[in-house]
Design a protein with these regions (language model features):
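Internal amphipathic alpha-helical repeat/solenoid segments
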Residues: 63-75, 96, 107
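Glycine-rich, proline-tolerant flexible connector loops at the mouths of alpha/beta enzymes
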Residues: 89-103
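Active-site region of glycoside hydrolase catalytic domains
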Residues: 1-54, 97-99, 108-475
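Catalytic domains of carbohydrate-active enzymes, especially glycoside hydrolases
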Residues: 69-90, 301-307
Length: 475
C-alpha cells in the first residue's frame, strides 16, 4: 500500500523564475524578461513593456541567481533526499531569438552541467520545454503562436533538446499550464503563446488559434521524442483547479460543468489525440476554421505518455444569468467557497480537491500522472536567530500529500511522483514578487532587491526530508 517504491519525490522551479543571468551565456530576451514586478499589497499587477526599458523593475533578470548557485542548491535538494528535480530549459538560452539555424552551445552546456550535477546525487531531472519563457523576437516579429511558423521553431528547439539530453532526461513536458489562457488576458496570452494583442484583435479567437498551434507543436514533439529515443516519456502540463458548483441549483451545476469544459479541453486533445465535441461545436458556432486534416493526423499520432499537472486550490462558480444555452463561464462567475480557508493571496486551501482532481483525470484518461506543482506561498518571517518557522507550509503539504496517498490507496490512481512548488524561494510568476515565498530553502532577497542571495533552511526542510525518507508513510 502507499506510494510506489520508485516514487519521484522532489521539487519544481522554472528557469525564468530562478536562473537570473538574463544576458549571460548568449541568452536572448524572453517574454518573461519584459514583465515588471507587481505587488500583492497595493494590488499593482505585472506590466508587459515593449522591450526592456531602463528604469523598470524586471525581477526575472536576476531571479534568485540559480545560474550561479545551482551546485549549492542541488546539494541542498540532495540533502533532503530528492529523487527528482523539475525545471525548464529556457528557450532563449538555446535559440536566443527562436529562429536561428544553429543552437547556442553555451546554453546547451549550462543544462548539461545542471543535469550532470543532478545525476551526481541520483536526482532525476524532469524537464518542461516551454514554461513562460518564449523568445521576445518570436512575439514581436512573428506574432507568436498566432503564426504557424512558431510550430516549426518549437519543434526544432524540442528536437535539439531531446537529442542532446536523451541519456540525461527521461521525463519531459511540452507547454506549462497550457490551459491558463482559457482566461483570455494579455498576461496569459504572452506567457503561453507569445501573443501580443493589437487594436482590433479578436482575443478569444487568437487564444484558440494559438492554443491549437501549440497543441500541434506538442504532438509533433511527442512523436519526435519517441523516434529519437523510445524510452523518453513526454507529458502535458495542465494547471488544474477543480470547479465546484456554488450550490445544488441546477444552473450552478451546469455553470461548473461549463467551466470545466472551458478550462480543461486542452488535456482532452493532449491525451486522446482529438478535440472534444463540445469545443468543435463552439468552433462551429463561432465560425472558427483553422483545424486542417493534417493537423488531425498529427494530433492523433502525438498523444502524451502521462499527465503532469499543478494543483494549488479549487474554485466555486455561481451562475450569473449569462450564456443560458452554452453555460460558458467568465472569471466573474467564480465565488468564494465559504467552507475553505485561503492564503494571503486569496488562494483557497482544499486538499480534498486534489484527490478529486486526480480522480477526474483517472476516470477519463487512465494515464499515469505526476503532480509537478503543489505548494504554499506565504510571507515567511526570518527570525533574529536565522530560523523560519513555516509550520503553515508543513500543514498545507501534509494534508495534500495525504490526499495523494488516499487517491493511490483507495482510488487506484497511478501516480508517478510529486515535485512540490518550489523547494527554494523564487520570483512569483503571477505577481513578480520575491516576498511570496514557497521554499523549504530561504533565499535572502526581497521585493526591494535587498539581500545577498544566501541560502538557509526553513523548518519545513527537515520535515520534507523525513517524508521522503519514509516514502510518505510519516507525515
Amino acid at each position: 500500500m502507499g506510494f510506489r517504491e520508485d516514487f519521484l519525490w522532489g521539487g519544481a522551479v522554472a528557469a525564468h523564475q530562478c536562473e537570473g543571468a538574463w544576458q549571460e551565456g548568449g541568452k536572448g530576451i524572453s517574454c518573461s524578461d519584459v514583465e515588471t514586478a507587481g505587488d500583492n499589497v497595493t494590488g499593482a499587477p505585472r506590466r508587459l513593456t515593449d522591450g526592456v526599458i531602463e528604469g523598470e523593475d524586471y525581477p526575472n533578470h536576476v531571479g534568485v541567481d540559480f545560474y550561479h548557485h545551482y551546485k549549492e542548491d542541488v546539494a541542498l535538494f540532495a540533502e533532503m533526499g530528492f529523487k527528482a528535480f523539475r525545471t525548464s530549459i529556457a528557450w532563449t538560452r538555446i535559440f536566443p531569438r527562436g529562429d536561428e539555424e544553429k543552437p547556442n552551445e553555451d546554453g546547451l552546456k549550462f543544462y548539461d552541467d545542471l543535469f550532470d550535477e543532478c545525476h551526481k546525487y541520483g536526482i532525476e531531472p524532469v524537464i518542461t520545454l516551454s514554461h513562460f519563457e518564449l523568445p521576445w523576437a518570436l512575439a514581436k516579429e512573428y506574432g507568436g503562436f498566432r503564426n504557424r511558423q512558431a510550430i516549426d521553431m518549437f519543434v526544432k528547439f524540442a528536437k535539439v533538446c531531446f537529442e542532446r539530453y536523451q541519456h540525461k532526461v527521461k521525463y519531459w513536458m511540452t507547454f506549462n499550464e497550457i490551459n491558463n489562457q482559457a482566461d483570455v488576458t494579455q498576461h496569459n496570452l504572452i506567457q503561453e503563446g507569445a501573443v501580443l494583442l493589437q487594436e482590433g484583435d479578436d482575443a478569444e479567437y487568437l487564444m484558440y488559434l494559438s492554443a491549437h498551434h501549440e497543441l500541434v507543436a506538442s504532438a509533433l514533439a511527442v512523436k519526435a521524442a519517441h523516434e529519437i529515443n523510445p524510452d523518453l516519456q513526454v507529458g502535458c502540463m495542465i494547471g488544474m483547479n477543480g470547479v465546484y458548483p456554488a450550490s445544488p441549483k441546477p444552473e450552478d451545476v451546469m455553470n461548473a460543468l461549463g467551466a470545466m469544459h472551458q478550462k480543461y479541453w486542452y488535456v482532452e486533445v493532449h491525451a486522446r489525440g482529438h478535440y472534444p465535441r463540445h469545443i468543435l461545436k463552439k468552433f462551429e458556432r463561432k465560425g472558427y476554421d483553422f483545424i486542417t486534416e493534417e493537423d488531425k493526423k498529427i494530433l492523433a499520432e502525438g498523444k502524451v505518455d502521462y499527465i503532469g499537472f499543478s494543483y494549488y486550490m479549487s474554485f466555486a462558480t455561481k451562475y450569473q444569468g449569462r450564456n443560458e444555452k452554452t453555460f460558458d463561464y467568465v472569471p466573474e462567475d467564480f465565488v468564494r467557497n465559504t467552507y475553505l480557508k485561503a492564503s494571503d493571496w486569496g488562494w483557497q486551501i482544499d486538499p480534498l480537491g486534489l484527490r478529486w482532481c486526480l480522480n477526474w483525470f483517472n476516470d477519463r484518461f487512465e494515464l499515469p500522472m505526476m503532480i509537478v506543482e503543489n505548494g504554499f506561498g506565504a510571507y515567511d518571517k526570518k527570525e533574529a536567530d536565522g530560523t523560519v518557522d513555516d509550520q503553515y507550509r508543513i500543514d498545507y503539504l501534509k494534508e495534500h500529500i495525504q490526499a495523494m496517498k488516499d487517491a493511490v490507496e483507495y482510488d487506484g490512481v497511478d501516480l508517478l511522483g510529486d515535485t512540490m512548488w518550489s523547494p527554494i524561494d523564487i520570483v512569483s510568476a503571477s505577481t513578480g514578487e520575491y516576498d511570496k515565498r514557497y521554499g523549504f530553502i530561504y533565499v535572502n532577497y526581497n521585493n526591494n532587491h535587498e539581500g545577498d542571495f544566501s541560502r538557509s533552511k526553513k523548518k519545513s526542510f527537515d520535515w520534507y526530508k523525513h517524508v521522503i525518507e519514509t516514502n510518505g508513510e510519516k507525515l
